[in-house]
Design a protein with these regions (language model features):
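Catalytic histidine neighborhood in serine/cysteine hydrolases
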Residues: 154-171
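Conserved alpha/beta-hydrolase "acid-adjacent" motif
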Residues: 140-145
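Conserved small/polar residues in nucleotide/adenosyl-binding loops
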Residues: 1-5, 182-187
Length: 191
């Protein structure tokens, strides 16, 4: 059904949601902290979309972020790192809030750190936006990411939903993999 990013954008458009696809820099860039480059990119993108909401004919108070796997980590990062830009202001766009109004994470990766704890770069607070997580139990590498993040959201009083499926593994996008997965239906419900 949906695996490529442009297909996900098309699915969102069919729901009446304007989708913006961000191609971000990979985390490891010489001279930058591990997660700094992609966080800069998503902060700038959300600020840009919000600053240009009128021209894009969208509601600036309904800008969300969605990510799959490592993109889920990036979406969670911007959901918790929005008070201060991670780069010097370029123009007026960087004075506009880069806080997403909601967050959808599909089989997010890297949300847990060592010793079964939430990754240190994720400082969940009551200001973290409402979040929906979609995860398969048989995703052995990253199921803890969703579980730890979900509990952190709940502890902070953030509205959070988690759809946990028994099968699906990792990397299925929104396609029907032959398993009992209704990811797009769950996401439709959450959006």
């Amino acid at each position: 059904m949906y695996k490529r990013q442009d297909e996900v954008c098309e699915w969102l458009n069919n729901l009446g949601i304007t989708a913006v696809l961000l191609k971000y820099r990979v985390p490891r860039r010489e001279g930058l902290e591990k997660h700094e480059a992609p966080l800069q990119d998503v902060q700038r993108a959300i600020g840009y979309v919000r600053a240009n909401a009128e021209n894009l004919n969208i509601d600036p108070k309904r800008i969300g972020v969605m990510g799959f796997s490592a993109g889920g980590h990036l979406a969670a990062m911007v959901s918790n790192n929005f008070l201060k830009r991670t780069y010097p202001a370029i123009d007026a766009t960087d004075k506009v809030s880069c806080r997403p109004d909601y967050c959808l994470l599909v089989y997010p990766a890297y949300l847990d750190g060592e010793n079964f704890q939430l990754a240190p770069e994720l400082k969940v607070s009551s200001a973290t936006p409402p979040t929906m997580l979609i995860q398969a139990e048989d995703d052995k590498s990253y199921i803890n990411s969703s579980i730890f993040y979900y509990y952190a959201l709940k502890e902070a009083g953030v509205s959070a939903w988690m759809h946990l499926y028994s099968q699906g593994g990792h990397g299925y996008g929104l396609r029907d993999t032959g398993c009992l997965l209704y990811t797009s239906d769950a996401a439709d419900e959450g959006l």
